Amino acid sequence: MTDFTRHTPETAPAAAKPVLEGAQKALGFVPNLYATMAEAPALLNAYAQLGELLNKSSFSPTEQQVVLMTNNRLNGCDYCMAAHTTISQASGVPADVIDALRTGAPIADAKLEALRQFAITVNETRGWPTQSDLDAFFAAGYGQQQVLEVILGTAFKVLSNYTNHVAST
């Protein structure tokens, strides 16, 4: 595969510098994903902004990780799965939920399992859930807002998972 450039805050295009500098300050390092995305500042900035928007969604941190880790697994992104395992642990996601998300096993919590199943459906149908898929999601206590937020989470993971695939981060 092509050896993609991994930028530092010093080598990044000007439009990418603020995100890399923010990551360096917050984490103490620049993740390889960000360093790679910096080559296309629009991608890096879109990814960072989508992440901020997802954090403002109606989903709890655990629900966010259900959507994100489900997409990581379905998209075969080991890098993101490892990163989100660490994020999930730091966010207080129960260990049994993390294990289920990593392996694709059902989650014991019925509402979280409904979310996982719906995230699978959105990913595998490329956004074409059936009415019965929607009805099952609604019956679990979710609404139209959460349908759209699953799409947001799925889009967020497409950016990172696909970047990791082509750049082998």
Task: Locate predicted features.
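Hydrophobic alpha-helical segments
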Residues: 1-169
